[in-house]
């Protein structure tokens, strides 16, 4: 049995890609997209029809060019998501514009609009996860959306404070970033030789997973942003893992046994009183890595969102 199939015995495997051909090849349960992945996929010839449809939608929407581009951009994200859903049995994650990361009300409005666009393509909201950055405002937006039956995936998650606040808000799923945490520490004090058990990104997800299980939070933990297969194998047993096509390929080509590393704890603890905004901001602020990586992640997604909009504007 190859390692990918071995992992699938213990963990739901999710494809971290907007490339539909890759998704079909690796047969994941779910798929995640983001502006960076959509920008990459939009440059591939085989997806031209999805872009043309989004452009036509933008023109039909009318208004200023800026409004047409915004409409086309939302439609493109949904077109990719709907196309991906034809190849997977589970859910697709579609991201709310990162520029709304500090605006609760506009994030809620955008999420409802994306769900509406999916429903116009006969895609039920039970097959969609709305991705939001795990800022205080994003978490509060998700809390409201969950009450409306719109499940959310809280992304760009780097600190324990972010994870705990998401669980306390009743968020459906979180995506703690393994690789970007590893990158930050590696740039400052490299792990040489590399020992996966000492990888700060791996340790972060393990701590979150254990805490959620010990306190019986139902929020799903989906490890994300991997740099190497060792990180993935060290988190086998995590609820879900979202993996890029290049690492899915490596795992599929290795015929080595896979051992479950994360197992729900039999120890149970009472849940603490939910964090206040002040407590959240203080706890998150105490983690220099998390502060830096969350800010950077929002900026990078915003840059790629603008590039995607420029690509669409040139075609309008």
UniProtKB/Swiss-Prot annotation:
GO molecular function per UniProt: transaldolase activity
Superkingdom: Bacteria
PROSITE patterns to which the protein is assigned, alphabetical: TRANSALDOLASE_1 (PS01054), TRANSALDOLASE_2 (PS00958)
Pathway entry: Carbohydrate degradation; pentose phosphate pathway; D-glyceraldehyde 3-phosphate and beta-D-fructose 6-phosphate from D-ribose 5-phosphate and D-xylulose 5-phosphate (non-oxidative stage): step 2/3
Record: active site: 131 (schiff-base intermediate with substrate)
Enzyme Commission designation: 2.2.1.2
Primary location class: cytoplasm
Gene Ontology BP terms: carbohydrate metabolic process; pentose-phosphate shunt
Keywords in alphabetical order: Cytoplasm, Pentose shunt, Schiff base, Transferase
Transmembrane segments: none
Annotated GO CC locations: cytosol
Catalytic activity annotation: D-sedoheptulose 7-phosphate + D-glyceraldehyde 3-phosphate = D-erythrose 4-phosphate + beta-D-fructose 6-phosphate
Compartment list: Cytoplasm
Protein's job: Transaldolase is important for the balance of metabolites in the pentose-phosphate pathway.
Similarity comment: family membership: Belongs to the transaldolase family. Type 1 subfamily.
Subunit and partners: Homodimer.
Protein name: Transaldolase 2
Organism whose genome encodes this protein: Salmonella choleraesuis (strain SC-B67)
Annotated gene: tal2
């Amino acid at each position: 049995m190859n390692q990918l199939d071995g992992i699938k015995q213990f963990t739901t495997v999710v494809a971290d890609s907007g490339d539909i051909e890759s998704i079909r090849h690796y047969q994941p349960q779910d798929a995640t997209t983001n502006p960076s992945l959509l920008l990459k996929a939009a440059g591939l010839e085989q997806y031209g029809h999805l872009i043309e449809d989004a452009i036509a939608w933008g023109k039909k929407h009318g208004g200023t060019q800026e409004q047409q581009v915004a409409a086309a951009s939302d439609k493109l994200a949904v077109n990719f998501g709907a196309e991906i859903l034809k190849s997977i049995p589970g859910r697709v994650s579609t991201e709310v514009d990162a520029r709304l990361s500090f605006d609760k009300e506009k994030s809620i409005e955008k999420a409802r609009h994306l769900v509406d666009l999916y429903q116009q393509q006969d895609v039920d909201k039970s097959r969609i996860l709305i991705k939001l950055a795990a800022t205080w405002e994003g978490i509060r937006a998700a809390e409201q959306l969950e009450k409306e039956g719109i499940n959310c995936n809280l992304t760009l998650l780097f600190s324990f404070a972010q994870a705990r606040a998401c669980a306390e808000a009743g968020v459906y799923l979180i995506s703690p970033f393994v690789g970007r945490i590893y990158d930050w520490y590696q740039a400052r004090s490299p792990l040489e030789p590399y020992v996966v058990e000492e990888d700060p990104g791996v340790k972060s997800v393990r701590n979150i997973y254990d805490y959620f299980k010990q306190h019986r939070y139902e929020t799903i933990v989906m490890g994300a942003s991997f740099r190497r297969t060792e990180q993935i194998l060290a988190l086998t047993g995590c609820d879900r893992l979202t993996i890029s096509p290049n690492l899915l390929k490596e795992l599929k080509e290795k015929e080595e046994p896979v051992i479950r590393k994360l197992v729900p704890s039999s120890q149970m603890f009472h849940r603490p009183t939910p964090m206040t905004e002040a407590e959240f901001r203080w706890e998150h602020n105490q983690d220099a890595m998390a502060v830096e990586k969350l800010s950077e992640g929002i900026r990078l997604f915003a840059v790629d969102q603008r590039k995607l909009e420029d690509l669409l504007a040139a075609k309008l």
